[in-house]
Amino acid sequence: MKLTMFVVGLLGLLAAPGFAYTVNINGNDGNVDGSGQQSVSINGVHNVANIDNNNGWDSWNSLWDYENSFAATRLFSKKSCIVHRMNKDAMPSLQDLDTMVKEQKGKGPGGAPPKDLMYSVNPTRVEDLNTFGPKIAGMCRGIPTYVAEEIPGPNQPLYSKKCYTADILWILRMSFCGTSVETY
């Protein structure tokens, strides 16, 4: 019995690193002064991707929950969390993101320009985070959280509200806009 438990424990230690990993991407992320570092953690078992952008006060963290089709971005300078539906036409699948991250490792911007997604942030705070699933609820719990709706592509140039932009690995640019971006 002890030998069986030892073998199972050893297999668990050897198999666990295969389920989730982190890739660090250094370079210009397009935010503020162009310095910083992004890291992407992909967990295929839980169907989530976690993107961390470390850039001082303009740092942010984004969680893409492929299981529930919601994404959340925590803006540290705004001390808030913004939740939105994932646009599966613009946001890569978990498998494609995995491939893109591996291809971008150690490289700077290049290739096609990033896809643009623009969101209008509703200024009303979210009361029940559980509607977005346990992963996003856990990330946004305890901080003001707002819901954002995607602004259709043709209307983007006409939208003149203040925006906070998050560039993700030179493949996707997400802008969160509203009437008072300073508050969220």
UniProtKB/Swiss-Prot annotation:
<dbReference type="InterPro" id="IPR007084">
    <property type="entry name" value="BRICHOS_dom"/>
</dbReference>
<feature type="signal peptide">
    <location>
        <begin position="1"/>
        <end position="20"/>
    </location>
</feature>
<keyword id="KW-0732">Signal</keyword>
<feature type="domain" description="BRICHOS">
    <location>
        <begin position="54"/>
        <end position="148"/>
    </location>
</feature>
<keyword id="KW-0497">Mitogen</keyword>
<keyword id="KW-1015">Disulfide bond</keyword>
<dbReference type="GO" id="GO:0030141">
    <property type="term" value="C:secretory granule"/>
</dbReference>
<feature type="disulfide bond">
    <location>
        <begin position="81"/>
        <end position="140"/>
    </location>
</feature>
<comment type="function">
    <text>Has mitogenic activity and may be involved in maintaining the integrity of the gastric mucosal epithelium.</text>
</comment>
<dbReference type="GO" id="GO:0008083">
    <property type="term" value="F:growth factor activity"/>
</dbReference>
<dbReference type="InterPro" id="IPR051772">
    <property type="entry name" value="Gastrokine"/>
</dbReference>
<dbReference type="GO" id="GO:0008284">
    <property type="term" value="P:positive regulation of cell population proliferation"/>
</dbReference>
<keyword id="KW-0333">Golgi apparatus</keyword>
<dbReference type="GO" id="GO:0005576">
    <property type="term" value="C:extracellular region"/>
</dbReference>
<keyword id="KW-0964">Secreted</keyword>
<comment type="similarity">
    <text>Belongs to the gastrokine family.</text>
</comment>
<dbReference type="GO" id="GO:0005794">
    <property type="term" value="C:Golgi apparatus"/>
</dbReference>
<dbReference type="Pfam" id="PF04089">
    <property type="entry name" value="BRICHOS"/>
</dbReference>
<dbReference type="GO" id="GO:0051781">
    <property type="term" value="P:positive regulation of cell division"/>
</dbReference>
<protein>
    <recommendedName>
        <fullName>Gastrokine-1</fullName>
    </recommendedName>
</protein>
